[in-house]
Amino acid sequence: MVGDLVAKLHAFAEVGQVILTRNIPDYDEVVAAENTLIIQNTSPKGFGANHNVAFAHATAPYFCVLNPDIELPANPFPALLAALNSGSASVLAPAVVNSAGRPEDSARHFPTPLRLAAKLLGGHDGRYVLIPTQGPTPVDWVAGMFMLFRAQDFKAIGGFDEQFFLYYEDVDICTRLWKAGRPVMVCPQMQVMHDAQRASRKNWQFMKWHAASMARYFWKHWGRLPRRSVS
């Protein structure tokens, strides 16, 4: 799976460098290729820490955070880069759908206790309704499975907060970008595929990480969410 994704990325003219982090030794074989850097961790790091290390090796004016289980039916980068270059967004994401073509919850409103309670009771879960014909649209936050940053803005904001081991690091960095006046947007016209693995609903350790990250996010941003929370 990872090898196929790396090969596909190298086929895109817009991709000048691929940085792959082996956090645990269970990836399939990735054939060494020009402009591919493989970082082998001696012990597992968190999501944010891994991407901060990767960014330290990145040389391009754009930095893409990409999960290895993302599938790219078409090259998303021409449209995404054109949208970044023509607007003010600091980070841009495509719309994410599952294998059945149904939208994933990859662009959402900032979490609040009220919104979380509504979700638990079967109400609205905070996701945006994205229309494929829409142009780039401001949203509160986009999921870390696919985030295309302006490298200068990622650096200026200090990258991911490594105190989030797993979960909420994407919400946190988008919150900090909005607070700094750096917009977060999604491009509904461009779609990628992802089948979410809700590990936090199945594994006790992931549940603990999820709860700890949620608590840290609310402690860090409680009462201090950006004034510009888009509807």
Say what each PLM segment does.
Residues 140-158, 162-191:
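A short, conserved alpha-helix in the catalytic core of glycosyltransferases
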Residues 20-29:
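A conserved acidic beta->alpha catalytic loop
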Residues 41-58:
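Glycine-rich, basic loop-to-helix element that forms the pyrophosphate-binding segment
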Residues 1-12:
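Short, well-formed alpha-helical segments that are part of the catalytic scaffolds
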Residues 63:
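Short aromatic/hydrophobic "clamp" motif used to bind/position activated sugar donors
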Residues 168, 175-231:
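Active-site-adjacent helix/loop segment of glycosyltransferases
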Residues 111-140:
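Short, flexible, basic/aromatic active-site loop/helix in glycosyltransferases
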Residues 74-105:
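Conserved donor NDP-sugar-binding/catalytic core segment of glycosyltransferases
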